[in-house]
């Protein structure tokens, strides 16, 4: 009797073991199927989406770079135009420099006569507002002294230009006279009745480009 019970118990354990093994095999096969599906999803869908994302990012990056370059070039164009040389359109016999025209006389006269001659040609005895202009006048005048537009009431008064603006003392004026003239040493002063050549200057409101006639420059 006991032997029969033992045999029956052993058979039950073997059946349960078989069921457990079958279940494990079934679960294993299902796991493989699920794993295969996951691999297929990862291998077919995710890379495509990832590549699409990469593509969109690259397109946007290129677009941003192109826009930045275009804006940079556009901002530089006005600056380049500002640096384009401006050629002053001066009357015959006058010399253009910057935004002014200058006339260097061959005749001689006192300071008052020289100023009157300049006024007759819609100008004044020469004014300068920078060292570049002053160096140009010194270079072009030759060896002769020339009256310019500086004058003062006395040595106790400031220097005034012929347009009634005060001289900034950009360059020291030598001498104790009441009228200024340009010499090889720079700006000097002397008596108004002394006869010298003179320089007239006037502003111009327009410039000529490179195309067409170009006035004489030094």
Curated annotation (Swiss-Prot):
InterPro entries linked to this entry: C-type_lectin-like, C-type_lectin-like/link_sf, C-type_lectin/matrix_domain, CTDL_fold, NKR-like_CTLD
Topology of this chain in the membrane: Single-pass type II membrane protein
Transmembrane segments: 53-73
Regions of this protein lying in the Extracellular compartment: 74-218
CDD domains, sorted: CLECT_NK_receptors_like (cd03593)
Tissues expressing this chain: Detected in ileum, liver, kidney and in IL2-activated natural killer cells.
Disulfides per UniProt: 90-101, 118-200
Main location: membrane
Keywords, ordered alphabetically: Cell membrane, Disulfide bond, Glycoprotein, Lectin, Membrane, Receptor, Signal-anchor, Transmembrane, Transmembrane helix
Cytoplasmic side: 1-52
Highest rank taxon of the organism: Eukaryota
SUPFAM superfamilies per UniProt: C-type lectin-like
Any one Pfam family match given in the protein's UniProt record, by short name: Lectin_C
GO cellular component: plasma membrane
Protein name listed in UniProt: C-type lectin domain family 2 member H
Organism expressing this protein natively: Mus musculus
Name of the coding gene: Clec2h
